[in-house]
Amino acid sequence: MGENTSLEKATFGAGCFWHVEEEFRRVPGVVSTLAGYMGGWKEHPTYEEVCSKTTGHAEVVEVTFDPAAVTYDHLLRVFWDCHDPTQLNRQGPDIGTNYRSVIFYHSPDQERAARASLEHEQRSGRHARPIVTEIVPAATFWWAEEYHQHYLEKRGGGSCRW
């Protein structure tokens, strides 16, 4: 960790949080990752409630990082690379608004960076369809149940990626 550096948070939804957490956990400069829920109206949601699509929440990963060791722009690159941002309310076989592509920004600087990154990604020619990723202010982060935390790491790797 950088000397006298404050840690920052970034929050991303890109489908099943098991895979997304595993992608960010491996990035040098990321201090911690947590699987959880954000963006809905139900307080203290459970996994079953979120999967029922009645809470408005997305499965997300809260990333705590040292900005002296890894930039927010680099985390955005990981986000774009770990899912298909052109799929509306789904990733592969996982279907529903809880699997939506979303960037929850924690500051005006993060919002600007996320919007610029989306524009760049759209112009890159990497995607045949328009990007549907939402960019919205961060809301209350609700931790997912313990068995979801570091799910793939606890099982020796693997992937839930389609």
From Swiss-Prot:
Keywords: Oxidoreductase. GO terms for biological process: cellular response to oxidative stress; protein modification process. It is an enzyme of class 1 (oxidoreductase). Gene3D superfamilies: Peptide methionine sulphoxide reductase MsrA (3.30.1060.10). One of its GO terms (cellular component) is cytoplasm. Disulfide bonds: none annotated. It comes from the Bacteria. One of its GO terms (molecular function) is L-methionine-(S)-S-oxide reductase activity. The active site is at residue 16. SUPFAM superfamilies: Peptide methionine sulfoxide reductase (SSF55068). It catalyses: L-methionyl-[protein] + [thioredoxin]-disulfide + H2O = L-methionyl-(S)-S-oxide-[protein] + [thioredoxin]-dithiol; [thioredoxin]-disulfide + L-methionine + H2O = L-methionine (S)-S-oxide + [thioredoxin]-dithiol. Its EC number is 1.8.4.11. Belongs to the MsrA Met sulfoxide reductase family. HAMAP family: MsrA. PANTHER family: PEPTIDE METHIONINE SULFOXIDE REDUCTASE, PEPTIDE METHIONINE SULFOXIDE REDUCTASE MSRA 2. This is Peptide methionine sulfoxide reductase MsrA. It comes from Geobacter sulfurreducens (strain ATCC 51573 / DSM 12127 / PCA). The lineage of its organism: Bacteria, Pseudomonadati, Thermodesulfobacteriota, Desulfuromonadia, Geobacterales.
